[in-house]
Amino acid sequence: PVRKWLYQTPEQILIKASNGASDFGNKFGQPLICGSVLTFEHEENNEKYAYDKVIMLAGGVGYGTQRDCLKGSPEAGNKVVVMGGDNYRIGLGGGSVSSVETGRYSSGIELNAIQRANAEMQKRAYNVVRALCEEDENTIVSIHDHGSAGHVNCLSELVEDCGGLIHMDKLPIGDETLSAKEIIANESQERMGLLIDEKAIEHVHKIA
């Protein structure tokens, strides 16, 4: 009998993973020069041992200057800036769902936890960060990506040492039905949190 796969067949994963990575690299304008797809399955004494999820890596090559390799310390007056896409009901609980066996949660929860890429938006955010880094004086005090738990993670780590004031009503909303919890915890992609020197806010706004 044909084996039933929970989501995709191995062949579909290999093809779609490669296509997806290449598509994102093309839209972002960055060559995809390395990558891998790793899985494992072994049967012994009528017992099957296998990775529950496929591991995929993709990458390129970049560089950074020594001046920009360490984050600065937040100071009173620094402005918290969020760059990138709007907030949607995307990636909710992504960190939790990715850490348990496939099928543990309902399909609805798992689908909400899946992140959706936006290469064009990532390119826009990248261009701003690169422009600031290539100036004679980098006005970025600290920077943090929006990973697991979205704004909750990113913004709290930016102001961890001193605390800060975040205006939720200024966070860009793409879906007006989002609750407060969904606004601060979603993992909508291609967003970056920055601490900016207060006197440079208008300059950053012009570049963005």
Protein language model features and the residues they cover:
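Glycine/proline-enriched, intrinsically flexible loops and inter-domain linkers
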Residues: 1-208
